Amino acid sequence: MTAITDIIAREILDSRGNPTVEVDVLLEDGSFGRAAVPSGASTGAHEAVEMRDGGERYGGKGVLKACDLVEGEIFEAIAGMDAEDQRRIDEAMIELDGTANKSRLGANAMLGVSLAAAHAAADVQGLPLYRYIGGMNARVLPTPMMNIINGGAHADNPIDFQEFMIMPVGLPSFSEALRCGAEVFHALKSRLKADGLNTNVGDEGGFAPHLRSAEQALDVIMDAIEAAGYKPGEDVALALDVASTEFYKDGQYVLEGADESHDAEGFSQYLEKLVNKYPIVSIEDGMAEDDWDGWRALTQRLDGRCQLVGDDLFVTNPERLAKGIETGAANAILVKVNQIGTLSETLDAVDMALRSGYGAVMSHRSGETEDATIADLAVATNCGQIKTGSLARSDRTAKYNQLLRIESLLGETGMFAGPSGLAS
């Protein structure tokens, strides 16, 4: 009844107009699952590799090769398998690929199959995905990290840091937190317009105004929070994605917008200064992806005061996370399903983090689709945090809307994480 009988792969477009892989998995009893794969702009060097076509078509970014691999080698390897045996399916693909970084089959091909199989298995059971994966204990609605100002690789402005986010930690429910975020977003738009600044939105729905420094961006967000009728640090906290690998050059953190340059110790002091000045509760990629000494120094300086999230540092890889836990680098992991390429490995990374006292943040990518799987995964794992962009663009709001549906399904059994999901 739950045997995989067919797999269909197609090339679709993501939110940036680039091709990506969508996969349908069909089962013997007629059950069905579908998943579309996201893609990043600023990618870590240690991420699993996407399969792209090369050549002139779509500027080399086509995924027809990946689709052929899904319908060919991958289908042959897992045809007839029980869709409810997720780990067996994922391990079969990992063995078939045979590389450390999924480079032979492509993480985009493998992930599409992995997630679609999970959706099909949930369909067999007649369960929503979060309940199928997480069981009866899946009931924590995550606190959102809402990206409202973009910089770095996500924007054409001088701001060195990639994302400036708000976290409505002081609201009583997910739906109220979402309303708060939307109201701050619109208050920020009004403030930027009044200052004569650009209010176009970037890849993740945040604004990309021409501001020169992190402090300028944080100041205008603080004003927007208050203008919307909320208290900074009480109702709404701040979070940063520094994406420091993007400006790490020859052992120095070069802030071109602010016209500053720091070694690891100096940059950790700079970040500490921001934490002292603003209600910042989370900093992502505060040090470069291979600056382990810098990460340890930053963690020693801010652990207990601020969540320190490893994205490029850990790339959702349990082996790199284990090294971080052992050496005292960071205190939380950003979880991106396409960084590792299978659902089983993603769940392993979350489990390792939470068991070790690390925080976990379920995350989108800058190139997204209408697929809302990560919303279900955030609830399934009870990780307590989700990062899925701003309060604009349907590729971002699709995840928030799915969480609203889940909140409604959970009813009184659901619990909003608030500040409790944070690692610090």
Curated annotation (Swiss-Prot):
Fetch the InterPro entries from UniProt: Enolase (IPR000941), Enolase-like_C_sf (IPR036849), Enolase-like_N (IPR029017), Enolase_C (IPR020810), Enolase_CS (IPR020809), Enolase_N (IPR020811)
Q: Which top EC class is named for this enzyme in its record?
A: lyase
Q: GO cellular-component terms in the record?
A: cell surface; extracellular region; phosphopyruvate hydratase complex
Q: How is the cofactor bound?
A: Binds a second Mg(2+) ion via substrate during catalysis.
Keywords annotated in UniProt = Cytoplasm, Glycolysis, Lyase, Magnesium, Metal-binding, Secreted
Catalytic machinery residues: 204 (proton donor), 336 (proton acceptor)
Q: Does the keyword rRNA-binding apply?
A: no
Instruction: Output the Gene Ontology terms for molecular function.
Output: magnesium ion binding; phosphopyruvate hydratase activity
CDD domains, per the entry? enolase
Binding annotation for (2R)-2-phosphoglycerate: 162, 336, 365-366, 387
* Listed EC numbers: 4.2.1.11
Question: What's its catalytic activity?
Answer: (2R)-2-phosphoglycerate = phosphoenolpyruvate + H2O
Q: Which cofactor does it need?
A: Mg(2+)
Which family does the record assign?
Belongs to the enolase family.
Q: HAMAP family, alphabetically?
A: Enolase
Q: Which NCBIfam families does the record match to this protein?
A: eno (TIGR01060)
Please state what the protein is called: Enolase
The gene behind this protein is: eno
